[in-house]
Amino acid sequence: MRERLFSLISKYGLRANSDLGQNFLIVDDIIERNVERAELSGRDVVLEIGPGLGVLTDALSKRAGKVYAIEKDPRLVEILRKEYNWSNVEIIEGDALKVDFPEFNKIVSNLPYQISSPITFRFLGYGFERAVLIYQLEFAQRMVARPGDRNYSRLSLMVQAKSYVELVERIGRGAFYPRPKVDSAVIVLEPKPKSEVIELNEDLVRALFQHRRSTVAAALKKSHHMLGLSKAEFKNVKDVISSAPYAEKRVFQLSPEEVKEIEAYLKVNNII
Protein backbone atom coordinates (compact mmCIF):
# COMPACT_ATOMS: atom_id res chain seq x y z
CA MET A 1 0.00 0.00 0.00
CA ARG A 2 2.76 2.43 0.98
CA GLU A 3 4.68 1.70 -2.22
CA ARG A 4 1.53 2.29 -4.29
CA LEU A 5 0.97 5.68 -2.67
CA PHE A 6 4.52 6.94 -3.23
CA SER A 7 4.46 5.57 -6.77
CA LEU A 8 1.39 7.70 -7.54
CA ILE A 9 2.88 10.77 -5.85
CA SER A 10 5.98 10.39 -8.02
CA LYS A 11 4.06 9.61 -11.21
CA TYR A 12 1.84 12.69 -10.98
CA GLY A 13 4.31 15.03 -9.26
CA LEU A 14 1.83 15.57 -6.45
CA ARG A 15 2.17 17.95 -3.56
CA ALA A 16 -0.31 17.61 -0.73
CA ASN A 17 -2.71 20.53 -0.40
CA SER A 18 -2.39 21.77 3.18
CA ASP A 19 -5.51 23.94 2.74
CA LEU A 20 -7.49 20.71 2.35
CA GLY A 21 -5.74 19.02 5.27
CA GLN A 22 -4.07 16.40 3.08
CA ASN A 23 -1.88 14.06 5.12
CA PHE A 24 -1.80 10.58 3.58
CA LEU A 25 -1.68 7.58 5.94
CA ILE A 26 1.32 5.45 4.91
CA VAL A 27 1.44 2.66 7.51
CA ASP A 28 -0.12 -0.51 6.11
CA ASP A 29 -0.72 -2.08 9.53
CA ILE A 30 -2.85 0.85 10.71
CA ILE A 31 -4.93 0.71 7.53
CA GLU A 32 -5.49 -3.02 8.00
CA ARG A 33 -6.42 -2.61 11.66
CA ASN A 34 -8.98 0.07 10.83
CA VAL A 35 -10.55 -2.12 8.15
CA GLU A 36 -10.75 -4.94 10.72
CA ARG A 37 -12.29 -2.59 13.29
CA ALA A 38 -15.06 -1.73 10.85
CA GLU A 39 -16.19 -5.40 10.92
CA LEU A 40 -17.05 -5.37 7.22
CA SER A 41 -18.93 -7.91 5.16
CA GLY A 42 -20.38 -8.02 1.66
CA ARG A 43 -23.65 -6.49 2.88
CA ASP A 44 -21.97 -3.29 4.12
CA VAL A 45 -22.05 0.05 2.34
CA VAL A 46 -19.13 2.21 3.48
CA LEU A 47 -18.79 5.98 3.37
CA GLU A 48 -15.23 7.31 3.18
CA ILE A 49 -14.43 11.02 3.47
CA GLY A 50 -11.18 12.14 1.85
CA PRO A 51 -9.92 9.00 0.09
CA GLY A 52 -6.75 10.77 -1.02
CA LEU A 53 -4.83 8.41 -3.29
CA GLY A 54 -7.07 5.44 -2.59
CA VAL A 55 -4.93 3.33 -0.27
CA LEU A 56 -7.66 2.87 2.36
CA THR A 57 -10.35 2.84 -0.34
CA ASP A 58 -8.66 -0.11 -2.02
CA ALA A 59 -8.57 -2.08 1.23
CA LEU A 60 -12.24 -1.27 1.90
CA SER A 61 -13.27 -2.36 -1.60
CA LYS A 62 -12.01 -5.87 -0.89
CA ARG A 63 -14.21 -6.30 2.21
CA ALA A 64 -17.35 -4.22 1.66
CA GLY A 65 -20.20 -4.61 -0.78
CA LYS A 66 -20.02 -0.95 -1.82
CA VAL A 67 -17.80 2.04 -1.04
CA TYR A 68 -18.72 5.69 -1.59
CA ALA A 69 -15.64 7.93 -1.40
CA ILE A 70 -16.14 11.70 -1.27
CA GLU A 71 -13.12 13.71 -2.45
CA LYS A 72 -12.93 17.50 -2.74
CA ASP A 73 -9.63 17.77 -4.64
CA PRO A 74 -10.28 17.42 -8.40
CA ARG A 75 -6.65 16.33 -8.97
CA LEU A 76 -7.14 13.31 -6.72
CA VAL A 77 -10.56 12.52 -8.19
CA GLU A 78 -8.99 12.28 -11.63
CA ILE A 79 -6.16 10.05 -10.38
CA LEU A 80 -8.53 7.73 -8.50
CA ARG A 81 -10.73 7.27 -11.55
CA LYS A 82 -7.76 6.71 -13.83
CA GLU A 83 -5.57 4.44 -11.69
CA TYR A 84 -8.08 2.06 -10.12
CA ASN A 85 -10.52 -0.33 -11.71
CA TRP A 86 -12.93 -0.83 -8.82
CA SER A 87 -16.29 -2.38 -9.59
CA ASN A 88 -17.81 -1.54 -6.20
CA VAL A 89 -16.39 1.95 -5.53
CA GLU A 90 -18.04 5.22 -6.50
CA ILE A 91 -15.94 8.38 -6.31
CA ILE A 92 -18.04 11.45 -5.52
CA GLU A 93 -16.38 14.80 -6.24
CA GLY A 94 -17.44 17.47 -3.78
CA ASP A 95 -17.32 18.97 -0.31
CA ALA A 96 -18.30 16.39 2.32
CA LEU A 97 -19.94 19.13 4.38
CA LYS A 98 -22.28 20.04 1.52
CA VAL A 99 -22.93 17.08 -0.78
CA ASP A 100 -25.88 14.78 -0.19
CA PHE A 101 -24.67 11.56 1.38
CA PRO A 102 -25.74 8.34 -0.33
CA GLU A 103 -27.23 5.60 1.82
CA PHE A 104 -24.58 3.85 3.92
CA ASN A 105 -24.31 1.87 7.13
CA LYS A 106 -20.62 2.25 8.05
CA ILE A 107 -18.01 5.00 7.91
CA VAL A 108 -14.25 4.50 7.66
CA SER A 109 -12.08 7.57 7.10
CA ASN A 110 -8.82 9.36 7.70
CA LEU A 111 -10.58 12.70 8.10
CA PRO A 112 -9.23 16.09 7.00
CA TYR A 113 -8.63 17.59 10.42
CA GLN A 114 -9.99 21.06 9.69
CA ILE A 115 -13.51 19.66 9.18
CA SER A 116 -13.41 17.31 12.19
CA SER A 117 -16.08 19.10 14.21
CA PRO A 118 -18.70 19.87 11.52
CA ILE A 119 -18.35 16.48 9.81
CA THR A 120 -18.69 14.65 13.14
CA PHE A 121 -21.89 16.52 13.98
CA ARG A 122 -23.13 15.77 10.47
CA PHE A 123 -22.42 12.04 10.94
CA LEU A 124 -24.45 12.06 14.16
CA GLY A 125 -27.51 13.08 12.17
CA TYR A 126 -27.37 9.84 10.18
CA GLY A 127 -28.32 6.31 11.15
CA PHE A 128 -25.15 4.29 10.76
CA GLU A 129 -23.99 1.14 12.55
CA ARG A 130 -20.30 1.78 13.13
CA ALA A 131 -17.64 4.36 12.30
CA VAL A 132 -13.85 4.04 12.43
CA LEU A 133 -12.30 7.49 12.15
CA ILE A 134 -8.86 9.06 12.43
CA TYR A 135 -8.77 12.44 14.13
CA GLN A 136 -6.18 14.81 15.51
CA LEU A 137 -5.27 13.43 18.97
CA GLU A 138 -6.47 16.48 20.89
CA PHE A 139 -9.86 16.33 19.16
CA ALA A 140 -10.17 12.59 19.81
CA GLN A 141 -9.38 13.12 23.49
CA ARG A 142 -12.19 15.66 23.71
CA MET A 143 -14.59 13.19 22.13
CA VAL A 144 -13.96 10.60 24.86
CA ALA A 145 -13.53 13.00 27.81
CA ARG A 146 -15.85 12.34 30.74
CA PRO A 147 -17.77 14.93 32.79
CA GLY A 148 -15.28 16.77 34.98
CA ASP A 149 -12.27 16.00 32.78
CA ARG A 150 -10.05 18.87 31.62
CA ASN A 151 -10.94 18.15 27.96
CA TYR A 152 -14.71 17.77 28.50
CA SER A 153 -16.56 20.06 26.08
CA ARG A 154 -19.73 20.57 24.07
CA LEU A 155 -18.32 18.02 21.61
CA SER A 156 -17.89 15.41 24.37
CA LEU A 157 -21.43 15.94 25.61
CA MET A 158 -23.14 15.83 22.20
CA VAL A 159 -21.20 12.82 20.93
CA GLN A 160 -21.79 10.81 24.11
CA ALA A 161 -25.49 11.73 24.24
CA LYS A 162 -25.97 9.86 20.96
CA SER A 163 -23.22 7.26 20.71
CA TYR A 164 -20.70 5.00 22.38
CA VAL A 165 -17.22 6.35 21.68
CA GLU A 166 -13.82 4.76 22.26
CA LEU A 167 -10.27 5.90 21.53
CA VAL A 168 -8.64 2.65 20.39
CA GLU A 169 -5.21 3.68 19.09
CA ARG A 170 -2.83 6.60 19.22
CA ILE A 171 -0.91 7.30 15.98
CA GLY A 172 2.41 9.15 15.79
CA ARG A 173 2.88 11.89 13.21
CA GLY A 174 5.44 9.76 11.35
CA ALA A 175 2.60 7.52 10.11
CA PHE A 176 1.57 10.20 7.61
CA TYR A 177 2.98 11.89 4.53
CA PRO A 178 3.56 14.75 4.63
CA ARG A 179 4.24 14.60 8.36
CA PRO A 180 1.63 16.63 10.32
CA LYS A 181 2.53 18.82 13.30
CA VAL A 182 0.37 16.80 15.71
CA ASP A 183 -0.28 13.20 16.70
CA SER A 184 -3.51 11.46 15.73
CA ALA A 185 -5.84 8.82 17.13
CA VAL A 186 -8.38 6.25 15.97
CA ILE A 187 -11.92 6.62 17.29
CA VAL A 188 -14.63 3.96 17.04
CA LEU A 189 -18.19 5.32 17.17
CA GLU A 190 -21.35 3.26 17.56
CA PRO A 191 -24.73 5.03 17.75
CA LYS A 192 -26.76 4.19 20.84
CA PRO A 193 -30.12 2.43 20.51
CA LYS A 194 -32.99 4.92 20.18
CA SER A 195 -34.10 4.13 23.73
CA GLU A 196 -30.73 5.33 25.07
CA VAL A 197 -30.22 8.39 22.88
CA ILE A 198 -30.54 11.72 24.70
CA GLU A 199 -31.78 14.43 22.34
CA LEU A 200 -30.56 17.79 23.62
CA ASN A 201 -31.53 21.36 22.80
CA GLU A 202 -28.45 22.56 20.90
CA ASP A 203 -29.01 26.24 21.70
CA LEU A 204 -29.02 25.38 25.41
CA VAL A 205 -25.86 23.29 25.09
CA ARG A 206 -24.08 26.11 23.25
CA ALA A 207 -25.24 28.64 25.85
CA LEU A 208 -23.93 26.49 28.69
CA PHE A 209 -20.59 25.55 27.15
CA GLN A 210 -19.88 29.13 26.07
CA HIS A 211 -18.88 29.41 29.74
CA ARG A 212 -17.85 25.85 30.57
CA ARG A 213 -15.90 26.77 33.74
CA SER A 214 -18.81 28.76 35.18
CA THR A 215 -21.65 27.38 37.26
CA VAL A 216 -24.84 26.47 35.41
CA ALA A 217 -26.70 29.49 36.81
CA ALA A 218 -23.87 31.88 35.89
CA ALA A 219 -23.46 30.41 32.41
CA LEU A 220 -27.17 30.73 31.65
CA LYS A 221 -27.22 34.32 32.88
CA LYS A 222 -24.17 35.27 30.79
CA SER A 223 -25.59 33.53 27.70
CA HIS A 224 -29.28 34.42 28.05
CA HIS A 225 -29.23 36.03 24.57
CA MET A 226 -28.32 32.61 23.10
CA LEU A 227 -31.61 31.31 24.50
CA GLY A 228 -33.50 34.06 22.68
CA LEU A 229 -34.12 36.12 25.82
CA SER A 230 -34.06 39.91 25.67
CA LYS A 231 -32.65 41.87 28.64
CA ALA A 232 -36.17 42.60 29.82
CA GLU A 233 -37.25 38.96 29.53
CA PHE A 234 -34.10 37.84 31.31
CA LYS A 235 -34.82 40.16 34.25
CA ASN A 236 -38.20 38.47 34.70
CA VAL A 237 -36.75 34.94 34.81
CA LYS A 238 -33.43 35.58 36.56
CA ASP A 239 -34.61 34.02 39.82
CA VAL A 240 -36.09 31.02 37.98
CA ILE A 241 -32.72 30.40 36.31
CA SER A 242 -30.98 30.64 39.69
CA SER A 243 -33.16 27.75 40.89
CA ALA A 244 -32.44 25.48 37.91
CA PRO A 245 -31.27 21.91 38.60
CA TYR A 246 -27.51 21.75 39.21
CA ALA A 247 -27.42 25.56 39.34
CA GLU A 248 -24.18 25.57 41.35
CA LYS A 249 -22.48 22.80 39.41
CA ARG A 250 -19.75 23.71 36.90
CA VAL A 251 -20.85 23.28 33.29
CA PHE A 252 -17.90 21.01 32.42
CA GLN A 253 -19.08 18.58 35.12
CA LEU A 254 -22.52 18.00 33.57
CA SER A 255 -23.54 14.66 32.08
CA PRO A 256 -25.97 14.49 29.14
CA GLU A 257 -28.67 13.29 31.55
CA GLU A 258 -28.17 16.33 33.79
CA VAL A 259 -28.32 18.73 30.85
CA LYS A 260 -31.60 17.06 29.86
CA GLU A 261 -32.96 17.77 33.36
CA ILE A 262 -31.97 21.43 33.04
CA GLU A 263 -33.63 21.56 29.62
CA ALA A 264 -36.87 20.08 31.01
CA TYR A 265 -36.91 22.62 33.84
CA LEU A 266 -36.39 25.55 31.46
CA LYS A 267 -39.16 24.26 29.18
CA VAL A 268 -41.64 23.90 32.04
CA ASN A 269 -40.88 27.49 32.99
CA ASN A 270 -41.26 28.68 29.37
CA ILE A 271 -37.67 29.90 29.15
CA ILE A 272 -36.82 27.81 26.09
UniProtKB/Swiss-Prot annotation:
HAMAP family: 16SrRNA_methyltr_A. The keyword rRNA processing applies. Belongs to the class I-like SAM-binding methyltransferase superfamily. rRNA adenine N(6)-methyltransferase family. RsmA subfamily. It comes from Thermococcus onnurineus (strain NA1). Keywords: Cytoplasm, Methyltransferase, RNA-binding, rRNA processing, S-adenosyl-L-methionine, Transferase. It comes from the Archaea. Disulfide bonds: none annotated. GO terms for molecular function: RNA binding; rRNA (adenine-N6,N6-)-dimethyltransferase activity. It is found in: Cytoplasm. CDD domains: AdoMet_MTases. S-adenosyl-L-methionine binds at N23, L25, G50, E71, D95, N110. Specifically dimethylates two adjacent adenosines in the loop of a conserved hairpin near the 3'-end of 16S rRNA in the 30S particle. May play a critical role in biogenesis of 30S subunits. It is an enzyme of class 2 (transferase). The keyword Nucleus does not apply. InterPro entries: KsgA/Erm, rRNA_Ade_diMease-like_C, rRNA_Ade_Mease_Trfase_CS, rRNA_Ade_methylase_Trfase_N, rRNA_adenine_dimethylase, SAM-dependent_MTases_sf. It holds the Pfam family RrnaAD. GO terms for cellular component: cytoplasm. This is Probable ribosomal RNA small subunit methyltransferase A. Gene3D superfamilies: Ribosomal RNA adenine dimethylase-like, domain 2, Vaccinia Virus protein VP39. Its EC number is 2.1.1.-.
